[in-house]
């Protein structure tokens, strides 16, 4: 065991995209599905970044587009006071 230092274990669990893991859930991403979209915005109305949610880049773009659609027709707030 001499010569090589021990590797540190990562104490954080690797985030897995829930839409890649479950294709049926990916089909439910829609601007009318407010319950799903609200999981990806903060209580102040901001979109949560993918480094926090673990969403893949592809589905983060889809989510952001659908959140913007829902905001434009008034289903989601732009910001909360």
From Swiss-Prot:
It comes from the Bacteria. One of its GO terms (biological process) is translation. Keywords: Ribonucleoprotein, Ribosomal protein, RNA-binding, rRNA-binding. GO terms for molecular function: small ribosomal subunit rRNA binding; structural constituent of ribosome. Belongs to the bacterial ribosomal protein bS18 family. Part of the 30S ribosomal subunit. Forms a tight heterodimer with protein bS6. NCBIfam families: S18 (TIGR00165). PANTHER family: 30S RIBOSOMAL PROTEIN S18, SMALL RIBOSOMAL SUBUNIT PROTEIN BS18M. Binds as a heterodimer with protein bS6 to the central domain of the 16S rRNA, where it helps stabilize the platform of the 30S subunit. This is Small ribosomal subunit protein bS18. It comes from Leptospira interrogans serogroup Icterohaemorrhagiae serovar Lai (strain 56601). The lineage of its organism: Bacteria, Pseudomonadati, Spirochaetota, Spirochaetia, Leptospirales. The gene is rpsR.
